[in-house]
A protein has these predicted regions:
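N-terminal carbohydrate-binding accessory modules
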Residues: 1-49
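Short, acidic/polar
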Residues: 29-44, 261-271, 334-341
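Polysaccharide-binding and catalytic clefts of secreted carbohydrate-active enzymes
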Residues: 106, 110-273, 295
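Hydrophobic faces of well-ordered beta-strands that scaffold small-molecule active sites
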Residues: 21-23, 50-52, 92-96, 150-154, ...
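Acidic (Asp/Glu)-rich catalytic clusters
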Residues: 39-44, 85-87, 142, 268-273, ...
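Aromatic-lined substrate-binding rim segments of carbohydrate-active enzymes
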Residues: 35-111, 242-247, 454
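Carbohydrate-binding surfaces of carbohydrate-active enzymes
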Residues: 127, 131, 135, 147-150, ...
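Surface-exposed, active-site-proximal loop segments in enzymatic domains
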Residues: 56-75, 104-121, 219-223, 327-328, ...
């Protein structure tokens, strides 16, 4: 019997490594006569793994009766499809539900099952016979039994769907699972619930959910946080049930889960702990033109996965789109696919599953159509991306950065603070690692707090531990002083500011440290601070005032204000700064504290990240702007030695020589809405 495991950002079948680059093909939505020539096109693309759902409601032809061999309809012949994949030497990712969504009736479950939420006893009793039946049929195809199935997905994008199952979840007028969660969450302590909610309930059954955030009411924000925590609890309950059942039925290959891309409805790290791997589902608009911040969100999703996952992985990566979304996302170009894939690699992706590689009902703009014919422009782009992935081999790369940014899954699923800071990091082109406050301590020693004024006790203690162990925590404009229910909690003992000064009508130009100027629309003022005070001096405004008000504007020049402090704590340091977290300020802090920025473009719109393997460095760069751009990339002091370097474009194979001096000397040009990957090798070893 073979062993299948996940390690070193790959799946291993005994001693054979398998990189997770795959594509989705749905057998029951294609004419079986087209299976072979369609899969031949997939092979020509260079893909070696095929993923597929199996639809419960399609295979259950009568209650408790299943057709997996095509007796009632050739498209139901799951076994023939698995046999063909095996014959063609594809590895297989099997995704049998019970929910699959997949733009399919009822999301793939039967008409009877859909009446019940998936965490209910009724739903699970209906689902388990199908789960056992499909498992029994597919067991011989598991790689542990000499077959080709290497991963098994349990359910799909698990979600309580509170808008659909409101009453039965206890979110409306009567109690249910939500109240069961509260009893567990508050450890049967009704007084603790009443303190947190500022209520006087006589039983948990009286508690009602706040399922919409009202930001102006702190009490309701706290109650909303409990609603979001209920969602995470529910998802974990369902995931545990699904994974447990499949394992009981004999599945002994790694079990995977998928999740929405925003880290809100599901806690990714929890799902990976319940199973073996979790991946996000990412569907941006064409060339990031229709929704703001899409590239940043792709990169952030992979940065976060990089902090905890065995394989930073996209379980569903856009390849075509559901017909109802075409108006929202636009018609996809070859550049679109190159841009999003190189953006994912920049963020740290080590694998993905293209969904869908082949058109089918309700799904269009894939590189292969239902007849096995290709759309040449897209097919060629996918083939090029596959070759680039193989040449890069992201599974063996080491990310180069000394900077971390905190990540709270609870905050991310609720009020989502810290967005201005994350945007500023992106605009400054400063790469970083996320520090998951629910996970292990980061090994980075320079961390920025990207959160709001509330943070749970557990997470505040995590920050204190980080500082005590030698980390430098920087809070810009916001620091934790309350728990998740907006009750006072200041475990970091952060000095509160005494006032806020505005720079209306524009931003103030300020001198901070010795590294030039920063701008901020407001200042948080401090009178008495621990440690060393941080002082800014107002300079002449960068916005030229009208002539008649020039004298009034000049009155503020030279004024100095204490806007924070820095002090040692244990083996580390805490720095608190009452300014906007602008790109200029974040860069100035790196300079002041001698923290190198691994790679940084001098032109806006170009985003970079630096990785290394053995003695070589890999610069991944994208141009998200609408026009071609050239940029000089600066490398962190001391990272790349001065002298001659060989630069190879992994996509085109073009090779050139550059001379680096103090990290300067690398110029790149990128087409609009595209990217490139460069290998930098010391010239003497090339």
């Amino acid at each position: 019997m073979s062993e299948v495991r996940i390690a070193e950002k790959k799946v291993w079948v005994d001693q054979t490594p398998v990189k997770l680059l795959s594509g989705e093909v749905h057998y029951w939505r294609l004419d079986p006569h087209q299976w072979r020539n369609t899969l031949e096109r997939v092979q020509e693309m260079g893909i070696k793994i095929v993923a597929t759902y199996a639809a419960w409601d399609y295979h259950e032809i009568a209650p408790g009766q299943y057709d997996f061999t095509g007796e009632t309809e050739p498209r139901r012949n799951l076994l023939a499809f698995l046999d063909l994949l095996t014959e063609m030497d594809f590895w297989i990712i099997f995704r049998p539900g019970p929910y699959i969504y997949s733009e399919w009736s009822n999301g793939g479950v039967t008409d009877e099952a859909v009446k019940y939420h998936r965490g209910s006893v009724e739903f699970q009793q209906l689902a388990e016979p199908y789960m056992r039946a499909v498992t029994n049929i597919v067991l011989p195809y598991l790689a542990t039994n000499g077959g080709k199935v290497i991963l098994w997905q349990a359910d799909n994008e698990i979600d309580p769907w509170p808008h659909l199952y409101t009453e039965v979840l206890g979110l409306g007028t009567k109690p249910g699972p939500f109240q069961e969660f509260l009893i567990e969450h508050y450890q049967e302590d009704l007084d603790a619930l009443n303190r947190a909610w500022r209520t006087t309930y006589s039983s948990f059954e009286e508690a009602r959910a706040v399922s919409e955030i009202f930001r102006d009411d702190p009490v309701l924000v706290g109650r909303y946080n409990d609603f979001r925590a209920f969602g995470h609890w529910y998802v974990n309950q369902v995931a545990t049930w699904a994974a447990t059942r499949y394992r009981e039925y004999g599945v002994d290959v790694p079990i995977i889960f998928n999740a929405y891309s925003g880290v809100s409805t599901q806690r990714w790290a929890d799902l990976e702990a319940i199973g073996d791997l979790v991946g996000s589902d990412i569907y941006p608009s064409n060339e990031h033109l229709h929704r703001p911040g899409e590239q940043r969100h792709i990169i952030e999703a992979l940065r976060y996965a990089h902090t905890f996952s065995k394989v930073p992985y996209v379980a569903e990566f856009e390849a075509g789109i559901w017909h109802d979304w075409i108006r929202d996302v636009g018609a996809f170009t070859p550049n679109h696919y190159r841009l999003i894939c190189i953006s994912a690699l920049l963020g740290g992706a080590a694998g993905w599953n293209w969904y869908m590689l082949v058109n089918r009902d309700n799904w269009y703009q894939s590189p292969i159509n239902e007849w096995g014919w290709t759309r040449p422009d897209l097919f060629n782009a996918f083939t090029e991306i596959t070759r680039l992935f193989e040449r890069l081999d992201p599974t063996t790369l080491e990310k180069v950065t000394d900077t971390a940014v905190t990540f709270s899954p609870a905050q991310r699923s609720s009020s989502r603070p810290g967005q201005e800071m994350l945007l500023s990091f992106h605009e400054a082109d400063i790469d970083y690692a996320f520090f998951d406050l629910d996970g292990a301590l980061t090994d980075k020693k320079f961390a920025f707090y990207a959160g709001g004024p509330w943070l749970s006790e557990r997470e505040q203690r995590r920050l204190a531990e980080f500082i005590e162990n030698g980390g430098h925590l920087i809070c810009i404009g916001a620091a934790p002083s309350q728990d998740e229910h907006m009750l006072p909690l200041n475990l970091l003992d952060i000095q509160p500011y005494t006032g806020i000064m505005t720079g209306a009508p524009g931003k103030m130009n300020l001198k901070l440290f010795e590294h030039g100027t920063v701008e901020s629309a407001w200042l948080q003022l401090y009178q008495h601070v621990p440690g060393e005070p941080l002082i800014v001096e107002r300079l002449k405004s960068s916005a030229q005032p009208s002539e008649e008000l020039a004298l009034q504007f000049s009155l503020q020049i030279g004024q100095k204000y204490t806007i924070g402090y820095t002090e040692p704590r244990g083996a580390g340091r805490l720095t608190v700064i009452g300014l906007q977290p602008t790109p200029g300020l974040i860069l100035a802090l790196h300079h002041h504290y001698n923290v190198p920025v691994a790679s940084r473009s001098n032109i806006s719109g170009i985003t970079t990240a630096l990785y290394r393997r053995d003695g070589d460095y890999y610069l991944i760069a994208t141009n998200d702007s609408v026009d071609p751009r050239g940029a000089e990339v600066h490398f962190g002091h001391g990272l790349l030695a001065d002298g001659q370097w060989t630069v190879e474009n992994l996509d085109t194979g073009a090779i050139r020589q550059i001379t680096l001096q103090d990290g300067v000397g690398c110029f790149i040009t990128l087409p609009r809405k595209d990217g490139a990957i460069f290998r930098l090798s010391p010239a003497q070893s090339s």
